[in-house]
Amino acid sequence: MDSTAFAGASDYIDLNRYPLDRPGSAGYAKIVSDAAAQLADDGCCVLKGFIRRQALPDLVRQADLVAPRAHRSFNRTNAYFSEDDPDLPATDPRRRFYDRSNAFVPADNFGPETGLRAIYEFDPFQLFIKHALGADRFFRYADPLADVIINVVEEGGGFPWHFDTNNFTVTLAIQNGHGGGVFEYAPNLRTPEDERFQAVADVLDETSQAVRSIDLVPGDLQIFKGRYSLHRVTPVVGTQPRYVGIFSFVETEGMVGSPERTKQLYGRVLPIHHERAGLRSDRLKD
């Protein structure tokens, strides 16, 4: 399909099914209500077929173009992306490290002509996410490397159990691998006041009854409270990479990632990461 047919967010989003551009309509009220109900249940909402089927090949094409620019990392990490602390017991989840093989295309690869950037900067899109979350303070992430990114997962790669840095993450399934790549999560496992390390350890030990899984297909949009819900992606099977677009929003205006985590995820940091270090909305580990 000729990609020149796609110029803005309305060319990608199925606005008939999800009338983001009609906030005063009954249809809009329903999709907000439905999304809010899913989030209230377990902190996870999936909007099936959010992207028009005809537009998906263009998003895949764009992902194929930038995938070689992804920062690939092969290391061991814990759920908090923090350093080991030998003063803690060996069973503490902060001392439980797992192999991580992953790749992220930084946000500065997505200019205004790209589909992901067009969707992210579409004001009705931001307003809908804000309404679905019932957020009073809601801003686009100010991180120039991380506001709009693509996660590229190749054969054998995955993402071990972890918490997100920002409170609300919005992801778009663009392409699945031939197998694997299952999203698993333990909803609302911690709070801003309580890390609940034992509950985290139970998930890591595979003894927790809290873990759920969902199958996302290309075109599905997911709203997820990953700051408080432990989650992972199981290893991808087959030679076709898994592409997921990630749109990040926060409650603190001007917030960016920490220098340590930014370096881990994107292989580099910018002056803004050092300038704004410590600007956070809570006191959690990561």
Language model segments and positions:
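Short, contiguous, helix-prone interaction/anchoring segments in small proteins
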Residues: 35-54, 58
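Long, compositionally biased
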Residues: 80, 86-90, 168
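Catalytic core of non-heme Fe(II) oxygenases with the double-stranded beta-helix
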Residues: 109-117, 126-221
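Short, solvent-exposed beta-strand-terminating loops
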Residues: 60-61, 65-83, 186
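Catalytic core of Fe(II)/2-oxoglutarate
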Residues: 182-188, 192-286
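Hydrophobic residues positioned within well-ordered beta-strands of beta-sheet architectures
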Residues: 47, 168-170, 243-245
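Signature of the catalytic double-stranded beta-helix
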Residues: 51-53, 58-66, 70, 89-143
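Fe(II)/2-oxoglutarate
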Residues: 1-41, 269-286
